[in-house]
A protein has these predicted regions:
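Acidic, PIN/NYN-like endoribonuclease modules and their adjacent C-terminal/linker elements
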Residues: 102, 106-136
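A general structural signal for well-ordered alpha-helical segments in protein cores
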Residues: 25, 40, 44, 57-60, ...
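Generic structural signal for small/hydrophobic residues in well-ordered secondary structure
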Residues: 6-7, 47, 80, 105
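Histidine- and aromatic-rich ligand-binding microenvironments
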Residues: 6, 40, 93-95, 116, ...
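A generic structural signal for short hydrophobic patches within well-formed alpha-helices
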Residues: 10, 44-47, 119-120
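Active-site neighborhoods of divalent-metal-dependent phosphate/nucleic-acid chemistry enzymes
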Residues: 68-115
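Short, well-structured N-terminal submotif of metal-dependent ribonuclease cores
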Residues: 1-39, 49-62, 136
Length: 136
């Protein structure tokens, strides 16, 4: 199964003070070893905005240039708005970018690797699948 790795996992893994054996780091390593990891521009943008040192930004650009990228279409944006509204009606708060990331996973048949609990709540109300780390 192809995996989209969310900003929350990348940022934990790239922090200098992150424990090397954190569940998120272990899952990211496992996902990368499967060679079935994809990304999207929004996730790279969020990471680049969050890390100021130029060396760290260069490392992010280098890592992300090796990954296939999925790009949202107009239909994905419309479907993401619908998904967000569905979640909101169910009492689940999902941000605009998170709704689009979830929709990309649904559109491209991807599993999402995330440390963000909002996605767990959203997955109860849509076809979003979360990566369990059991392999591809």
């Amino acid at each position: 199964m192809t995996v989209l790795v969310d900003t929350s996992v990348w940022s934990l893994a790239l922090r200098r003070d992150a424990p090397p054996n954190s569940p998120e780091a272990v899952q990211l390593t496992k996902a990368l070893e499967s060679e079935l990891v994809v990304t999207t521009g929004l996730i790279m943008q969020e990471l680049l905005q969050g890390f100021l040192p130029e060396r760290t930004q260069a490392e992010i650009r280098r890592r992300f240039s090796a990954l296939p990228a999925v790009q949202p279409t107009r239909d994905d944006h419309v479907a993401a708005a619908d998904l967000r509204n569905t979640c909101r009606r169910a009492g689940v708060q999902l941000g605009t970018i998170d709704a689009l990331i979830a929709q990309l996973c649904i559109t491209y048949d991807l599993e999402l690797l995330s440390a963000d609990r909002d996605f767990e709540h959203a997955a109860r109300h849509c076809k979003l699948r979360l990566w369990a780390g059991t392999g591809a």
